[in-house]
Amino acid sequence: MQADELVDGVPYQNELLKQLVWPPSYQNPIPKKKYHLVVVGAGPAGLIASISAAGLGANVALVEKAHMGGDCLNNGCVPSKALLAYTQGNKDATFKDAFSWMRKIRASIAHHDSVQRYVDAGVDVFLGE
């Protein structure tokens, strides 16, 4: 699929991002009675804390209300930097091209913040409220 191709009216790259950071079929795990660490928020700090603790053998729960990656991946740092990088020195850049580029960059790095990566690392990921 191409970056501009639509899936149910949504750009393909947005759909790919969603599949990684909030998979529609994902089921929250049955909570353990006790965790060594409960992390609230799957932004950059929460992701590092949870995967590091799990790597050291801790029972870790990661709770995210919105999307894995937090504002940095989904709304803030990554999208704004990608838009700036694309348009810098490109006087012919269009809104459509810039946003297509931003979606491509965001989707290409989302696997680092994916639910599956953290589940595979031993983190109990809880999505929603």
Where does each model-flagged region fall?
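Residues forming the Rossmann-fold NAD(P)(H) cofactor-binding site
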Residues: L47
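Glycine-rich Rossmann-fold phosphate-binding loop(s) that bind the pyrophosphate
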Residues: G41-P44, K65-A66
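Glycine-rich flavin
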Residues: M1-Y35, I51-A58, V63-E129
